[in-house]
């Protein structure tokens, strides 16, 4: 029996008396077994649901279990009485449960409508396309790529089948990790899972026929659609979709005759195709069995959120498929198409939904996430079309930067200073930064349960050098109001000195200012009128025609960094170029951290609290990770309010308009303004004197976890309230205080280098058309890596006709050389990060890491090759190559063709010569993807349940913790769905808690899910994916699954080596763990080799320290097991000398090492004597 627990069924509830026959309130969350009987020979389905689930849920389970369901158009009956879709199971008429709690439902087939017919066809095509790498709607190649199922790691039933190959792999450890030949090509080639559609498909073609649409005279006879199918056997059939089902008709490619042919008909298209094609039936069942035997999450279709596409990959084989071109026609959910949806109304309606009880909150948050994600998907699609010139502008006579677009009910504009708002603050650079800060503030405010004011759905898309802002449309914004009135009710009037303030809006503004710690301050406008401000001067509120108030332009809600502003405003500073803009606001996490520190000091001073007491129980700091923001809990807010009520003297609000030349305060507020300036300086001092130095110190400690790449480093900086612009300050602190910490310095300078590259490449991309992007990027990359000793690249060979069409863009590409490129990159680094990138520093960086970081930041997908080795991977690429789609111009026939022959030969020779010299070729640039910033909030309810679970674990209440753990898991899956980045992170945390609760099997199962979802949504080589593999390895090891543990740890270390290099300090612990796992598998030689690597790394990175001595002692014991007593004696002597020097001769650890030294000395002497005799 298949047991399915839907997400909605996992909320806690009480169970009633299982023997009762009448339903009571306490029975609604009781689980019941359901048998579903079909009208044909389809096997009966059995599964379990709660009585609180609906008949619609039952229907969905049926469709999901069937995978490629033969029946999709049906209703359910109980004792021959039709059941409504939204009827709860427990409310079925005349339902009486026996002691076995089993319900038998019958499937009754319904007549088709055009929508139901399309759904039936769409479901079949969707299932058959699941394994195709191009099936995702993402703009990236192989989006959602997953390695885990292809690792062939033995588990469960296939343990014996795969154990021999796994043992052979284990015997190569650690050589296959630390080898020089380790590369992305070697890593990915055996995971290449591109099925050849012509071999694995169930038919050659299934598409809408050319006889569509159905003529009116046949519509009235019940005809819905006409289909054409080409079977694998090579036969072509024309099929009529009728209200009664599907049948083969007498149509041909030239004759229209939709009458039935023979007796080939069925209510199900699947069953009809099985009659027509034996190979279809055979391959469909093979596909079903293959899907059922594989991992469901790895194979599941991705809906609701954009998956991560790998930055390095193989091209996807392409084939003709009419159904792909007709996907929009076959899509059954017409109401979900972007051009028919009022995005603003949907988003605001979900925000205004009730959220008093748990079920209401679940529904509200689920719809909020779903609606904003649908909006984001449509915004990304529109932004790409906009940049590529496929959407007409509303104001085509304006310059490109000022043009506006409306597409699919979404407003698009460029993130540039089109009207001069930022002319005194940095122009386009300021506008670019302001857009990022604006969406950060919107996402932050979306976390609060505020129905007012309304916030626009917003998405920022960086694509091909352009920053595009996509927003929902304020109702009535394009309409002129009567009597010359304005939509503006709060904020400055554009182009004027007036300020408008509607007092009815003051309450909502006050609430927001309290949440964000913004101080109420006053502003004098051009008419010398004083107005209270609860936000920055730039923020505005508009009144829409729907009666809602919309708050926007939130890019300057947080204070400016006073110290940094002084530094960049110093015109006499000749050390660094001018900073690009003056919007140097601090992050909200820093404001929250400073607020908590001040509140702690206030509590200690006024309530006689211990000075070291922290406020984690009452306040939780703001944390922004990816798309998730973690804010103060409701309990924390209540505690803050309580403190404020106890003593109103506590004041730690900030004036975000300090240091602005256009901010004029009332004369009688001079003292208050001076206090605001003082607070801003205190915040800035706190950042530069405490937060940043402590952050560097925390990363420098041997026991700390150093981020694996720049993405992880930046997330750690944001959690600490540190802006990315302080990377240079962090690097300078390392050079001053920890010059020997080469690893940390390399990590920070790599990120400075990559981000500087991003800005330079972005400027070039913005002026180059789509057809020349691959030439530009390949040429830029070739010039970029000349710093590592590669020769100066030749100019790319651009088709003459294309070069003439885009003459200026071609000249821009030809003008690039390594000298000018590096000059621009170093200038960007000096300007943006106040740090000088020297040639010595650049030479020390890993080129693969730089290439990976550049591709991730710009959205570049490149062909999988070993670019920095002497080995040629042309053969590998040719196996997966797609024919070059560039147009070939051959010229006219006759003599001109003969004259061009020599020219063509010469061109070919120059092209071959160019490809031999250059590392990157235009065909190596496979794709350019958008980089997206969204305003989608994280689920407060799911996070609260997770925090409650952690709290129970700390208190030792394991039973309650286990219950809360299941609830948190259910809430995450209900709100986000299984396939989501936040669910991936939740899986990782929940697996760890399961492990701590000694629920080891559950921990392993959840950790496997975490690995798969991390790979599909965070990237197959992301830092979080690597850590997920390492955690899974440890959980497997605790389950005595040594072989699986070793294989997972090996894969994680390979990723670590590729992403960072061989000298990351945390690999010491990983190799130590791998050694223990190999020891448990009785692979003592391999175990010793891994521990030797850990010892060498520790010696190289940390020197002769206590941790290194501990590793030497472990190594000595392994050497003894391998009967290498001489080497063991040397290792233990090194450990003893280190401990004696660092801890002293009288320390317990030193004495223990001395004991082992004497033991190993005696052992070595005995073995020497035995060898002589």
Curated annotation (Swiss-Prot):
UniProt keyword annotation of Cell wall biogenesis/degradation present: no
Any single biological process term in GO: mitochondrion organization
InterPro entries the UniProt entry points to: CLU-central (IPR033646), CLU_dom (IPR025697), CLU_N (IPR028275), CLU_prot (IPR027523), GSKIP_dom_sf (IPR023231), TPR-like_helical_dom_sf (IPR011990), TPR_rpt (IPR019734)
Transmembrane helix found in the keyword field: no
Chief localization: cytoplasm
Annotated ranges, domain Clu: 316-565
Chain intervals with Basic residues compositional bias: 890-901
UniProt superkingdom: Eukaryota
GO cellular component: cytoplasm
TPR repeats: 984-1017
Compositionally biased intervals (Low complexity): 1-21
CDD domains assigned to the protein according to its UniProt record, in alphabetical order: CLU-central
Pfam families listed in its UniProt record: CLU, CLU_N, eIF3_p135, TPR_10, TPR_12
Subcellular location: Cytoplasm
Keywords: Cytoplasm, Repeat, TPR repeat
Region (Disordered): 1-25, 888-910
A Gene Ontology molecular function term of the record: mRNA binding
Function of the protein: mRNA-binding protein involved in proper cytoplasmic distribution of mitochondria.
Entry's family note: Belongs to the CLU family.
HAMAP family reported in the protein's UniProt record: CLU
Assembly, per entry: May associate with the eukaryotic translation initiation factor 3 (eIF-3) complex.
Name of the protein described by the UniProt record: Clustered mitochondria protein homolog
Gene: clu1
